[in-house]
A protein has these predicted regions:
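N-terminal strand-loop-strand
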Residues: 1-45, 58, 73
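Unchanged
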Residues: 51-180
Length: 180
């Protein structure tokens, strides 16, 4: 076979809410794991990992979530695919992203597998600057994740072109201890 094959991974974004009022107001937390291996060792990241050869993507998302956080049995929905060839220093990686939402008191989180820790973080993303350049609408966002033990900040650039076909890209300008 003459084509090199990329690696496939899944990541799962799990949001939690304290009660119905918090859900209505959009006060959510996100479940993150502290990476125990390279790349980005010691940084906080979404739970995820590599797809086994004979494994469906959704099964990978569920397996990695359970292995890294102890959380299982959640409904998951695929919402995006990321494939920038330079996004991972290890190899050419294509990631299918999944989403779930749960009442925080319904799950117990415990780090496992290659995760050094797992925890809920409050999230806040505020637009800092917005401008147009070369036909793109660009907005820089200040992303903050925090819990009772720590706080991390990142700067994300969103590039968007609207029309019949919308193009949207995200660029991490400053990671700040968040593996992205």
């Amino acid at each position: 076979y003459r084509y090199k094959n990329p690696c496939c991974t899944t990541d799962t974004v799990v949001f939690s809410y304290k009660d119905e009022q918090a859900l209505k107001e959009g006060r959510l937390k996100v479940l993150l794991v502290k990476r125990g291996n390279h790349p980005s060792i010691g940084c906080w990241a979404l739970p995820g990992g590599f797809v086994n050869l004979r494994e469906n993507l959704e099964d990978t998302a569920r397996r990695e979530l359970q292995e890294e956080t102890g959380v299982s049995g959640l409904p998951v929905e695929q919402f995006a695919c990321y494939g920038d060839y330079q996004r991972d220093p290890r190899a050419r990686i294509i990631t299918s992203a999944y989403l779930s939402i749960v009442k925080e008191s319904d799950v117990s989180v415990e780090a496992g597998d290659d995760a050094a820790d797992a925890a809920w973080f409050e999230i806040e993303m505020e637009p800092e600057t917005a401008y147009e350049e070369d036909g793109w609408e660009k907005t820089e966002y200040h992303l903050t994740i925090q819990n009772q033990d720590q706080k991390r900040n990142a700067v994300i650039l969103k590039k968007e072109r609207t029309g019949l076909v919308r193009e949207k890209y995200y660029v991490v300008k400053e990671g700040g201890g968040i593996a992205v």
